[in-house]
Regions:
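N-terminal single-pass transmembrane signal-anchor helix
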Residues: 1-29
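N-terminal helix-rich module
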Residues: 24-54, 58, 62, 66-168
Length: 168
């Protein structure tokens, strides 16, 4: 007599293998999705900093890029102090990615009319913003702001991590 189907053991083995492969695929997809969100947030914030500097140079006046609600993770606003409409642009973020800045750039970055970042009291400013990975992961995206106003997007493990709870 010829066999027409599969045995119970063959079916259970195939289902177990399918479940295992699905689990690996879902984990990889989740990690890839998180990495893409972090990369997009880093690029958007670096571009906003460059736009703020360019706007300050173009208008020859102070322009501020300020974190929404005091947290870069929720987005940022481009502001002009000497304009009828102080809000020039608003960038939204959904808070999916945690962004932390060191003390000088924790909540805002102000550019002079010459494109130089300034602290309160008009002292030169430099700092870095870190795009945080998920807890337990390394932070690999960092935006550095130099004293001259140059904005650079770096990829790699920072020397002094700013993100709480992450391993570096």
């Amino acid at each position: 007599m010829k066999q027409q189907g599969v045995t119970l053991i063959q079916m259970l083995f195939a289902l177990g293998l399918l479940a295992l492969l699905t689990q690996f695929g879902a984990t990889s997809y989740s990690e890839m999705s998180n990495e893409l969100h972090q990369q997009a947030a880093a690029k958007n914030l670096a571009q906003a900093l460059r736009a703020a500097r360019n706007e300050a140079l173009l208008r020859n006046q102070e322009i501020t890029l300020q974190a929404k609600e005091g947290d870069w993770s929720y987005g940022w606003q481009l502001l002009s102090e000497y304009s009828d409409t102080p809000l020039l642009r608003e960038y939204s973020a959904k808070g999916k990615v945690k962004i932390v800045g060191n003390q000088p750039v924790a909540q805002r970055v102000r550019f002079s009319g010459l494109g130089v970042p300034l602290r309160s009291g008009n002292a030169f400013l430099s700092g870095s913003l870190h795009i945080c990975g998920a807890p337990g992961q390394e932070d690999i995206h960092m935006i550095a702001l130099s004293r001259t106003g140059r904005v650079s997007l770096n990829r790699g493990i920072p020397i002094k991590p700013l993100c709480p709870g992450n391993v570096n």
